[in-house]
Structure formats: structure tokens, C-alpha cells
Amino acid sequence: MAGAIIENMSTKKLCMVGVALLLLQVLAFLVGGLIAPKPTSYVNPVAMKCVDVRKNHRSSKWLMPWGTEPCKSIQSFDEAANRMIEANDIVFAAHIPNSQFEMSPWFQFMLVVLQLDIAFKLNNYIEENSMVTLDVSVAYRDDLKEEWKELASSVEQRKLNCILPVEKTLANEGRHYDCDVIPLMELGSVSHKYYLFNIRLPVNERKKANIGIGEIRDLHVVSIFQNGGFTMVWFAMKTFLTPSIIIIMIWYWRRITMMTRSPVLLEKVIFALGFSMTFINIPVEWFSIGYDWTWMLLFGDIRQGIFYAMLLSFWIIFCGEHMMDQTERNRISVYWKQVGPIAFGSCCLFIFDMCERGVQLKNPFYSIWTTDVGAEIAMAFIIVAGICACLYFLFLCFMVYQVFRNISGKQSNLPAMTKARRLHYEGLIFRFKFLMIITLACAALTIVFFITTQITEGNWKLGDLSIELNSAFFTGVYGMWNLYVFALMFLYAPSHKHYGDGQSNDGAGMSSGEELQLTTTITHIDGPTEVYRLAGKEAQE
């Protein structure tokens, strides 16, 4: 009989494969931990307070904080008051990056947040639920001698969340508030070398614009971007892993098509998982180095979503097809109760992502976190997603427990077998349990990775919650996905070896009782694998 490679491989060879995969997994972690720098970096320039007394503030003149033609600036708002300069004539100008540096397409994205330094004054304090109005213009250029070109401009409102750590008394005047960072904009590509931000805080008492926001002392324009060195390591991993998965996927499907039977459900799902892994591996990001593809962040989220959906569905089907409860499954329709919610959840994630990053393709200043309702919905989504992920993990653990329990029940039939048959099935069950444990470990690590990335993307805090994810964790989990898919397609591919009764001539052969108990009657040489026969889930031919 022709079974899967995992059923015919000796324990010694299986251990060798396991050690090789483990070494590659350790290598994936070391690549991130020792070679790659931290995934993200940031620059935090303090915006220069430029004076622009022109009547038409909307004209095309850009105010530079430094350079050959720096703007006329002031040191503080006290100086502005002494010189009778109105607040509407003050422009916060910030150049990214700092002088003598350049931005690069290797940075992949740029997230910009604002940090306000606000001093407490008894006659000018921050009111409750105050909003700050920002008149923002962003320009770019690729040469220091070029004229600035407008990238985007908008008038945005952001909620001001500040806490004064001391009592509001006269003695504490001048103490600074502790304020949350204000999300400003996000760019899906960094295709230019220099960026200039001109930000006004227009005051309009009639419209209540920028009234009750305290005494602003300074404004920090914090720019967060992916490290170029990490991008190179990440691209190199993708470039190396893509052909590896494609080759094993072609080899796997070729072995299946050479058989006289049609593929069973588990084999189809494993191939689909390999295809989704290939889709996420293909390093199309190389093109973003030469082209201004602002949609790459959204495209990356879609690829990850497809892989997550396929991976979660595979684990459910993998456990169900090995339940050993004599229930005929082998059809995707049997799992609609489990796979349906995964598909629904994936669609919800896609809609949420389109509402955030989809809109940012047209308006980079848009953020769902800028309003109370949007922030509450987004936070609720993250909490619900985390809860659903944990519930899914618990349900998966329960299914694994059922599989192990049913296997233990089947093991009671082993003493009645011949020695050769008993050793064969004991090895088969051991290898299956080993693969189930590895699956459970991968599921746990994937859930942790999902929750961690969701929390970090949702907040981008500079304080309590670090904006940086561990490089070793990124590369290690990514390598784990690829090694897991590679191992599945290799171990569950049909074997060229044949296992029959002639292989155990020293025993009396398998009795009819054994065949009835374990449902392993051989119909033809290319029949379902022994795991499928043991589970009682043969393909309908």
C-alpha cells in the first residue's frame, strides 16, 4: 500500500528531518536577532516657530526651518506677544529627516504623529473634551535645490487628551501636561528624499477653533518608519523562501496527481495552504523601491488576511479529518459551521482595513482613531478580535484533545496485532501526535503574533507601549510559517514505498478482526493513506 511519507518514514529519518527544521527555525530567529536591526525607527524634530504675516496664508510659499533661506522665527510665544504677532501668523515648520540625512524607499512607510508640549496656566488651561484644529500642508522634493511640491494639505481636528500630574494651583503654573500623541498622517510609501511640514493652529473665537487648548510651548513632529536594514533582511528572506515553497508545492501536487484516486480533502487543503503561503511570500515589495506604490500596506494586509484565514481553516479541517470517530467527512461542506465564521471574520477585517488604509490612499490624514466614536469602535474591534482569537485557540485545543482521546481508544486494539503491525501503528500514532503538538505550538505562537501586531498597529505609543516589534520575533514567526507549510507538504505527500503484509513475514499477518477494528482494508495500491483508513474517512471514489 502507498501511504503518506510520514507513515512510511522511519523514526530515525523523521528525527533527522525534525532536527533540520528546528535548526532552520533557530536560524530564522537568529537572522532577526543578530543581523536585522530593530524593525522601526523614528525622528523627533521640534518644529520651528516661523512667522508668516502675509494676508494670504494659502499662497504657495513654503517656510523652511533651516537651510539657505530659513524662515523668520521666534523662540517662544512670549516673544510673539511682545512683538504683537498673532497666533494665526505663526507656522510650525519641520523638515524630515534632519539635516544631512535623506529618506529612502527602503523605509517602506511613514507614520507621522504630533507631540504637544503644553504648559499649565490658571487663566489658560485645557478644557474638558477640547479639540485642536490643525491646518497642515506637506511638501516634498528630491534635491536640495529643487522647489517644494505639495504632497497633501488639509484642515484636521484631533481630540486633545492631556492630564496634569499635579494640582491646579498657582505654584504649579508652567508645569507641563502629560498629553497623548496625536495621529497626523500615514504614507504607504517613502518615495521622496525630503519632506516639509507646515502646520498652523488657527484661532477663531466665533467657531471655537483652538480655544481652551492651553498654552502650547512646542510641537514635536514624530516620524516613524521601517528601518532600511530590516527591510533588506525581510526582502532577502522572502526572495529565498519563495522558490523553496513553490518547488515543494509543485513536487507535492505532482505526487498526488500520479495516483489513481482523486485527492482527498486534507490533501487539497494542504495544497491551498501552500498556495496562500506562496502568495504572501512573493516579494513584490522589490518594485516599491522604484515605484511610488502607496497601496502596498493595504495589499500586505490583504495577503496576510488570506493566509490567516487559510491557516485557521486548515487547523480545523486537519483536526476534524483525524477525529477517528467513524464519521464520514472529507467534504468542505461538513465544516461550514467552523469555516464559515472564519470567512465572516476575515471579511470584517477586510472591511475595517478598507475603512482605514483604503481611505488613506486618497487622504493620508484620515484615521479612524481621531474621533471618540471611531476610537471606541476600533478599540472594540481589537478587543473582540483578541477574544475571538483566544476562543478559537481554546476550541482548537478541545479538538486536539478529542483526537488524542480517540487515538488512545484505538491503541487498545494494538496488543492483538502481530509485532510488526503493532510497531508500525505505534510509530504512526507517535508521529501523528508529534505533528499535532507542533500544530498546537504554531497555533499558539500565531495567535500571540496576531494580537501583538493588532495592539501595536492600533496605538503606536511612544511611552508605555513600544512602537518597536522584536526583529527576531518577526523573522522567527515568518520562518515558522514557511517551515510548517514545507513540512506538511513533504510529510503528507504520497510515499513511493509500499507497505503490505509481505513486509512482516515473521508474523502471522493481520487477522480479519484487526482489519475490522482499524478499518484498514486495502482496496488498491493507491488508496487512501493509513491515517485516513485508521480514522475511517476514506475518499469517495
From Swiss-Prot:
It is found in: Golgi apparatus membrane; Cytoplasmic vesicle membrane. Residues 254-268, 325-331, 401-431, 493-541 are cytoplasmic. Keywords: Cytoplasmic vesicle, Developmental protein, Golgi apparatus, Membrane, Signal, Transmembrane, Transmembrane helix, Wnt signaling pathway. GO terms for molecular function: Wnt-protein binding. The chain crosses the membrane at residues 233-253, 269-289, 304-324, 332-352, 380-400, 432-452, 472-492. Residues 1-28 form the signal peptide. InterPro entries: WLS-like_TM, WLS_GOLD, Wntless. It is a multi-pass membrane protein. One of its GO terms (biological process) is positive regulation of Wnt protein secretion. Residues 29-232, 290-303, 353-379, 453-471 are lumenal. The keyword Transmembrane applies. It holds the Pfam family WLS_GOLD. Belongs to the wntless family. Required for a subset of Wnt-dependent developmental processes, in particular, eye and pronephros development. Regulates the secretion of wnt4, which is required for eye development. This is Protein wntless homolog A. The lineage of its organism: Eukaryota, Metazoa, Chordata, Craniata, Vertebrata.
